[in-house]
From Swiss-Prot:
It holds the Pfam family Alpha-amylase. Belongs to the glycosyl hydrolase 13 family. GlgB subfamily. Pathway: Glycan biosynthesis; glycogen biosynthesis. This is 1,4-alpha-glucan branching enzyme GlgB. It comes from Francisella tularensis subsp. mediasiatica (strain FSC147). The active site is at D318 (nucleophile), E371 (proton donor). Its EC number is 2.4.1.18. Catalyzes the formation of the alpha-1,6-glucosidic linkages in glycogen by scission of a 1,4-alpha-linked oligosaccharide from growing alpha-1,4-glucan chains and the subsequent attachment of the oligosaccharide to the alpha-1,6 position. NCBIfam families: branching_enzym, PRK05402.1, PRK12313.1. The keyword Ribonucleoprotein does not apply. GO terms for molecular function: 1,4-alpha-glucan branching enzyme activity; cation binding; hydrolase activity, hydrolyzing O-glycosyl compounds. Keywords: Carbohydrate metabolism, Glycogen biosynthesis, Glycogen metabolism, Glycosyltransferase, Transferase.
Length: 640
């Protein structure tokens, strides 16, 4: 089995070892020989096409090189009894469009299929694959990759900006190319202080409204924005600006458009044989057969492809619950229990462990993140310790609870105080990322600003309060594009964000400035990220003040030299002479206040130092007395 770190191999020979590992489900570089590859055979240059179709009677390659005609010389030959087919076509070349005509051995019916391993495809509504052999790129991110390999992300800052390339910005209503995005995106991410960008899926998909989560071309770069080299340049530029790149990846299911993977050889092939397991009615897709060796090779090799060829730093694995549970989104009677009578998908569990094991072994510094909405245990526990092996898990519970809380009238918040504190009960059970993602600002859920309670002033104040509380809460961070400058309408994938409001309204400009300053605070204060998953890094001062809806807690660095005190007031009431217990005697300085005038607040800031006094409060021997502004978060730091 070949083992390479970057750039596609143009050597087309399919060795016995490749074939063996492919059918055993252990080949992690299948894209090196599957699909269309440049070849020179008996002194003649051309393209070798290889595909897997175990129930095919015949497969013919048609395309620009033969005027889309079925010809005897372009029929593939079976090279194994388990469904590998291949043919060398001399006059095929880079840039030619092509498809496979696959005839089923039982029905004699034929289907026109795109190449599952194609590196590039036509833009919808066209569906042909495109021979792509010119993919070499000279990278300049060696320093980034060296640093990545040595980085422990658990005790380093991670502040992720999630975005959908097609709607971040457009040009005269048209998609920006990767090269056009290269001119503005890296600089914007860097100036705003985010450490990573998370791209929603970049593989080819026919329906814009699916946002990429119903793919057909798993190996094909999204053609809406350009070609392979353009995407590599964009990632390279991001890395050279010290910005990591995370990719949303969809290994659980696939689009059922007829040119894609569905019934690839005229019968279940990439999907499960049993319709109850294969058909995903909720999403209108088909689920991958994760117990089939060749399908596992397809998917794990795909993960390796994005990491090796595009230097992707992490994969956010979509819809993990759909992989883990046989009864996910299914009523009783619509699913078949496993061999032990349970609802766990044993094949899905084994696949996720194998995926994470392979990436840990071969891709130093690359992370995996689970989007998983149930309470499945040990998702971010290493495989060797009995877990699934992910590095992180999105904290969907925190997101649901806190967004519900922040939408309540402050009069009633005291009755639901547990919504804002409960997350710390289970926080250390997983390596959580606090995520406010695209899913929370679509389908009638309202934009983030419109989730906030009250009139316009209170909405803005509530947003600043909430985001400051989020920065202080243990766990890495993620926010969806548009929230940082207060987009009032829900996200729409068919148009660009409302960037014009930043120039038109001072409140939007002030909030954008707030996010930048908040991100600066996060990046500069070790206490906010060094002990996210260590009990030492967080301590409540007062978690029980439900009557006033005030939270207070301490964040600490490993060496205890840096301590930050957060006070979050979730009511529109100013509290004067508020006594707060503190861990150390000395003077404290306000280092952040979400009520600052420059952010659009009322300007109730503390310009002078605050000295502690030897009076017991909240279980501490020292206390300070402060004024807490309305709907605001204060951050204090011990300075001496």
């Amino acid at each position: 089995m070949k083992n390479k770190n970057s750039e596609q191999n143009t050597h087309s020979t399919i060795g016995e070892q490749d074939i063996h590992y492919f059918h055993e489900g252990k080949h992690i570089y299948a894209y090196e020989f599957m699909g269309a590859h440049k070849a020179c055979e008996e002194g003649i240059e051309g393209i070798r096409f290889t595909t897997w179709a175990p129930n095919a009677k015949s497969i013919c390659v048609i395309g620009d090189f033969n005027y889309w005609q079925v010809e005897d010389k372009n029929y593939m030959e079976p090279i194994t009894d388990a469904g590998l087919w291949s043919v060398f076509i001399p006059n095929a070349k880079n840039g030619d469009k092509y498809k496979f005509v696959v005839t089923n051995k039982d029905t004699n019916n034929y289907v026109y299929k795109s190449d599952p391993y194609a590196f590039f495809s036509e833009l919808r509504p066209n569906t042909a694959s495109i021979i792509t052999t010119e993919t070499q790129y000279t990278w300049s991110d060696d320093k980034w990759l060296e640093k990545r390999a040595k980085t422990n992300y658990y005790d380093n800052p991670m502040n992720v900006y999630e975005l959908h390339l097609a709607s971040w910005k457009t040009k005269n209503g048209k998609f920006l190319t990767y090269d056009e995005l290269n001119e503005t995106l890296p600089q914007y991410i860097k100036e705003m202080g985010y450490t990573h960008v998370e791209f929603m899926p970049l593989h080819e998909h026919p329906l814009d409204a699916s946002w990429g989560y119903q793919p057909t071309g798993f190996y094909s770069v999204n053609s809406r924005h350009g070609d392979i080299i353009g995407l590599k340049r964009l990632v390279d530029k991001l890395h050279n600006n010290d910005i990591g790149v995370i990719l949303d990846w969809v290994p659980g299911h696939f689009c059922k458009d007829q040119h894609g993977l569905i019934y690839f050889d005229g019968s279940p092939c990439y999907e499960y044989q049993e319709p109850t397991k294969a058909i995903n009615k909720g999403w209108g897709t088909h689920n991958f057969d994760l117990g089939r060796n060749e399908v596992k090779c397809f998917l794990i090799s795909n993960a390796m492809y994005w990491i090796n060829e595009f230097h992707i730093d992490g994969l956010r694995v979509d819809a993990v619950s759909n992989i883990l549970y046989l009864n996910y989104d299914r009523e009783d009677g619509q699913w078949i229990p496993n061999i032990y009578g349970g609802h766990e998908n044993l094949e899905g569990i084994a696949f996720l462990k194998e995926l994470n094991g392979v990436l840990k072994h071969t891709c130093k510094g690359v992370i995996t993140i689970a989007e998983e909405s149930s309470s499945w245990p040990d998702i971010s526990t290493p495989v060797e310790k009995g877990g699934l092996g992910f590095d992180f898990k999105w904290n969907m519970g925190w997101m649901n609870d806190t967004l519900r809380y922040i939408s309540l009238d402050p009069v009633y918040r005291k009755y639901h105080h547990n919504l804002i504190t409960f997350s710390m009960v289970y926080h250390y059970s997983e390596k959580f990322i606090l995520s406010i993602s695209h899913d929370e600002v679509v389908h009638g859920k309202k934009s983030l600003i419109n989730k906030m309670w009250g009139d316009l002033w209170n909405k803005y104040a509530g947003l600043r309060l909430y985001m400051s509380y989020m920065i202080g809460h243990p766990g890495k961070k993620l926010i969806f594009m548009g929230s940082e400058f207060v987009q009032f309408v829900e996200w729409r994938e068919y148009e660009q964000l409302q960037w014009q409001v930043v120039d038109q309204y001072e409140s939007h400009k002030q909030t954008l400035h707030f996010f930048k300053k908040l991100n600066d605070l996060y990046h500069n204060e070790t206490a906010l990220w060094q002990c996210d998953y260590d009990h030492h890094g967080f301590r409540w001062i007062d978690a029980d003040n439900s009557q006033q809806s005030i939270l207070s807690f301490i964040r600490s660095s490993k060496d205890n030299k840096q301590k930050l005190i957060f006070i979050c007031n979730f009511t529109p009431v100013t509290y004067y002479d508020y006594h707060l217990g503190v861990p150390d005697a000395g003077s404290y300085k306000e280092v952040f206040n979400s009520d600052n005038l420059e952010f659009g607040g009322s300007g109730q800031v503390m310009a002078t130092e605050i000295f502690s006094s030897p009076q017991s409060s909240h279980g501490f021997e020292q206390r300070i007395t402060i004024k807490i502004p309305p709907m605001a978060t204060l951050v204090l730091k011990l300075i001496k």
